[in-house]
Amino acid sequence: MDNPLAIFEATKEVSTIEMNAMVVQLQDRLMEMEQVEIVTLHKFLPGIYERTIIIPPWTVLTGAEHRTAYKVRLERGTIAVSTDTDVKILTGPFEFDAPAGFQRAGRVFEDEVVWTDIYENPDNCRNIEELENRLYVVPDIGLYEYRQLVKGELLCQEFGQQQL
């Protein structure tokens, strides 16, 4: 595919294999470009871990493949998001269940997007790196690369914590 953004212009469903290939190609192209800052917030509730990202307007991004099913809460904004076979345009507030096994791509429009992934966390783990290893297939770029840069420093904002 000459234009990796064509993933967002698809007018018909494609196979899961084709969609995955398009997401990976987009990811590779994006890693060659200047990176935008996406704020990540972590919230811990009893048995639940919420990871919220705040995505600036006009951003194109890819996520990591998820190892587990999870819930998504699109709190605000409009984003085109790849599914396993097509692209959906979602506007918050909106919630949905997301299956394991897929890497997604997103394209934000004129307003910032606030996107929260909600995961079961039965042992109430608060170690972000451990949670990432449980929840994602951590790529050699992106999450893993960022970990190497911060060398274990806790660079997350925790909010809404409750004492267990």
Predicted segments with their positions:
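Double-stranded beta-helix
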Residues: 109-164
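Conserved short histidine dyad/triad with adjacent acidic residue
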Residues: 48-66
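Short acidic-glycine-tyrosine-enriched beta hairpin
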Residues: 52, 83-104
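Glycine- and acidic-residue-biased ligand/ion/polar-headgroup-sensing regions
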Residues: 66-85
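Short hydrophobic/aromatic-rich beta-strand segments that constitute the beta-sheet cores
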Residues: 62-63, 81-82, 98, 117
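Short, surface-exposed beta-strand-loop junctions and turns on beta-sheet-rich folds
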Residues: 69-70, 87-89, 121-124
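Structural motif
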Residues: 78, 103, 112-114
